[in-house]
Amino acid sequence: MKRSSMDLVYKPISGTIGSVSGTIGSVSSVSGTIGSVSGTIGSVSGTIGSVSGTIGSVSGTIGSV
């Protein structure tokens, strides 16, 4: 029997999206000071490459009463 060109073997596409992890740091206020909000949007790595970023820091002072 002659095999046609349409007779193919399709392998399943499998992969892992890795892990998504991150910490939002800490938010603290002491004597009228809005501390710092810092965190890191961890990394998403897998067969689709990697995406990583950091949300810097936000800090300010309300002064004292």
Curated annotation (Swiss-Prot):
Physiological role: Precursor peptide which undergoes post-translational modifications by tailoring enzymes, leading to the mature natural product.
Signal peptide: none
Annotated TIGSVS motif repeat ranges: 16-21, 23-28, 33-38, 40-45, 47-52, 54-59
Modification after translation (UniProt): Is subject to maturation by TigE, that catalyzes the formation of methylcyclopropylglycine (mCPG) residues from isoleucine residues residing in the repeating TIGSVS motifs.
Protein name according to UniProt: Precursor peptide TigB
Keyword Transferase part of the UniProt annotation: no
Methylcyclopropylglycine PTM positions: 17, 24, 34, 41, 48, 55
Record keywords, A-Z: Repeat
Domain of life: Bacteria
